[in-house]
């Protein structure tokens, strides 16, 4: 969730925050269960080049074709409900990936459950009318980019292992009843925040 100075100070006071020197040697699976690596949106992908992955015979779940972001102009004093900035990020990602909107088989997103969701849904309806749309229930609060990464990881894992994709039910028939592709080749992963931070990435499976 979001970070605040008071939260960090509290964790630090009880000795539950790694020091800078300790972080230099941090590895996943630390033997010390009490220590905490505290971050806003605790979700990340471990990335490497295709060449490196193939050398060590690693499982490849997908490859990143492009990434783009766009921040809305403004004073960040209110909700940003327009989809213009989000669409700029999407267009940039598609252009970098040399991919047409019609080639996108699946849109992975992170709904907030409020009016902000309409900006993504508007772009989905207009630009990707034949693409499935999916998220998962493991949202990390209002940290949209981390929630989207979490959903993307689930989708890529299911596709790799031949597991049917499970998607979060929204209660909106337009979304819940939309057919999902069995073997999507290109995925658009996208997120947008209420203060106008927009992210889009294109993946090949």
Model-found features: residue ranges?
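Condensing-enzyme catalytic core mediating Claisen C-C bond formation in acyl metabolism
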Residues: 22-99, 103-106, 130, 185, ...
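Glycine- and aromatic-enriched membrane alpha-helices
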Residues: 117-131
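Short, solvent-exposed amphipathic alpha-helical segments in soluble enzyme
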Residues: 10-14, 123-125, 203-205
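Short, glycine-/Ser/Thr-/acidic-enriched flexible segments
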Residues: 51-52, 114, 193-195
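Conserved beta-strand positions
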Residues: 106-109, 189
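Structural signal for terminal/edge beta-strands and the immediately following C-terminal loop/tail
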Residues: 178-205
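Acyl-CoA/ACP chain-elongation machinery
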Residues: 1-15, 19-29, 33-34, 68-81, ...
